[in-house]
Design a protein with these regions (language model features):
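Beta-rich nucleic-acid/ligand-interaction surfaces
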Residues: 61-62, 186-189, 193-195, 335, ...
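Substrate-binding groove of N-acetylhexosamine-processing glycoside hydrolases
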Residues: 9-12, 16-18, 23-26, 91, ...
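Contiguous, structured surface segment used for ligand recognition
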Residues: 6-146, 397, 420
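Feature activates predominantly on carbohydrate-active enzymes
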Residues: 87-316, 325, 374-376, 380-382, ...
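Generic recognition of short, well-ordered alpha-helical segments
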Residues: 39, 43, 161-162, 359-360, ...
Length: 534
């Protein structure tokens, strides 16, 4: 029987008491009485089979029975009473109780989501040698909305099958929001010029993705940039006249065609994505006031012009029963103007580099009565490999600040500014965001680093965890000598240029240590693979 601290669970449950392990050598049965829980039963059974276990019909002699029970049913009452576990009102929306003891397992939830999350924890309790770690767990999330965003406009555009795998994976670690970032890669039938053929999400793809995600209790939040970041639209002559500057990046607020274009896009989005949120972006409108609206900005100021157009967007869209998210740049640029915003907007404050000092990003919105989410980042863009030496403290600090100040959600971001980033190296940061969003208070980085390899890769040797630490150290080493981490800029820098020669002189001093860290990581991963295959 493992001690509590040795169980590699991500996220960590709020309350966990150890019980004797259960032997699974004679099979496992999974039963669900509620129709809404039958997919969870199927998903759990599939996961157990993938672990090499035998899934048998309920009532099979000697098999460990898993019962998915709703709160208030006889099975739930019996399990809670036997474990002397109580049910708190905070657990109702997504919480669960798990009792794995005396040859049986009962997962209790007041909702389908709660039962599903209990089943995800049960998957992680299955250890080697066909054993299940016995435990009594009570658990529920700190934040209502726990998400990850993937930039599908500026880097590799994922296939529908890959996005489904992303959904399955984030759901397994109790994330419930998957946000897709669109500049020009959502296909609008009314605007066929915009989306690249074969490199965009079609309406049929969107419907399939939404339906698939719903089974895993994941809400798809579409983000269509509606103000800035629109060069791939405005580069076309048909739309160029709507730009603040010729073929630029920002819509001109004063152009009579700007708002109708946005309304048309979001009418299509409204028919494809039925969830409670849509995201209008509206960040980094750097060109605003440098072109057609310069006289207006000179007269009224940049903040009022920006906020007036954002308010017009919100008023024009205002879908019944849905909330509009927007990026919270204005808290930095014009905090005194925030009170002019419609109060039903949700401000998503973002910062990808700091480890503390987040209150000024949230307070202007909270003081104005707006709901807030926080958006840290995995720091995998513009880099050969994510800079987790920066990302982990950023995710840790920002989500903890959001919890403390009353934010209702966290959206951990993965960007592709350079067009070269791949998503797979981001899972380390994504899972830490899942832990920080579900667990109350400040997530422990060291604890996460100790758990990741076993929880995500199935490596119980610690080799994967140590490999990640070596790569963190490599980034920190490059930062310490002023080279800014393993950036694409450094990778592609011409070594014969004056700047390249300067960087090379600095690099030579740390190159042996840097290469050893990378070589260590390669050897450690190879060791983990060898142990797993053996």
């Amino acid at each position: 029987m493992l001690l509590l601290a040795q169980l590699p669970l991500i996220p960590q449950p709020r309350e966990l008491a150890s019980r004797p392990d259960l032997a699974l050598t004679r099979g496992v049965s999974v039963a669900a009485a509620q129709p809404d829980d039958r997919f969870t039963a199927q998903d759990l059974g599939d996961a157990l089979r993938e672990r090499g276990l035998r899934v048998v019909p309920p009532g099979t002699p000697g098999a460990v029975s898993v019962t998915l029970a709703r709160l208030g049913t006889p099975a739930a009452r019996h399990a809670l009473a036997g474990a002397r576990a109580t049910w708190d009102s905070a657990m109702t929306a997504e919480g669960y109780a798990l009792v794995a003891d005396s040859g049986r397992v009962t997962i209790v939830g007041a909702s389908a989501a709660g039962v599903f999350y209990g089943a995800q924890t049960l998957k992680q309790l299955v250890g080697g040698s066909s054993r299940l770690h016995g435990a009594v767990i009570r658990d529920w999330p700190a934040l209502r909305w726990r998400g990850v965003q993937d930039d599908v406009s500026r880097g590799p555009v994922p296939t529908l099958d890959y996005e489904k795998r992303q959904i399955r994976t984030i759901a397994a670690y109790k994330l419930n929001v998957f946000s897709l970032y669109f500049e020009h890669t959502l296909a609008y039938p009314a605007d066929p010029l915009i989306a690249p053929p074969g490199g965009a999400l079609t309406p049929d793809d969107a419907r399939a993705l939404v339906a698939y995600a719903a089974r895993y209790h994941v809400t798809i939040v579409p983000e269509q940039e509606a103000f800035g970041h629109l060069h791939h639209v405005l580069k076309h002559e048909r739309y160029a006249e709507l730009g603040e500057t010729p073929h630029g990046h920002v819509l001109a607020p004063g152009d009579s065609g700007s708002l109708p274009l946005i309304i048309g896009w979001f009418a299509a989005i409204d028919s494809l994505f039925p969830g409670p949120f849509v995201h209008v972006g509206a960040d980094e409108t750097f060109e605003l006031g440098r072109g057609r609206t310069k006289p207006l900005v000179d007269s009224l100021g940049l903040g009022p012009v920006y906020l007036e157009f954002l308010a017009r967007i919100a008023t024009a869209l205002h879908p019944a029963g849905r909330r509009l998210l927007f990026w919270g740049d204005v808290a930095v640029t014009s905090p005194d103007q925030v009170k002019a915003l419609p109060h039903d907007l949700v401000a998503v404050a973002w910062n990808y580099w700091s480890k503390d000092g987040f209150d000024p990003l949230l307070k202007p919105f909270l003081d104005a009565g707006l709901e807030t989410w926080v958006a840290p980042g995995v720091n995998g863009w513009n880099r050969v490999f994510p800079d987790y030496a920066t990302a982990l403290p950023n995710i840790q600090g920002f989500i903890a600040a959001g919890q403390r100040l009353g934010s209702t959600g966290a959206l951990n971001t993965s960007w592709d500014d350079d067009g070269e980033a791949l998503f797979e190296p981001n899972w380390y940061g994504v899972l830490f965001g899942a832990a920080a969003s579900w667990q109350p208070g400040t997530a422990d980085v060291a604890e996460f680093q100790r758990r990741f390899g076993a929880a995500f890769c199935g490596d119980t040797t610690g080799a994967v965890d140590e490999a990640e630490r070596r790569l963190l150290a490599a980034h920190a080493l490059l930062d310490s000598v002023g080279l800014g981490g393993a950036t694409d800029d450094l990778f592609w820098l011409d070594p014969w240029s004056a700047r390249g020669q300067t960087a090379a002189a600095v690099m030579r001093a740390v190159a042996p240590r840097l290469r050893l860290l990378a070589e260590d990581a390669i050897e450690l991963v190879a060791r983990a693979r060898s142990t797993s295959s053996g």
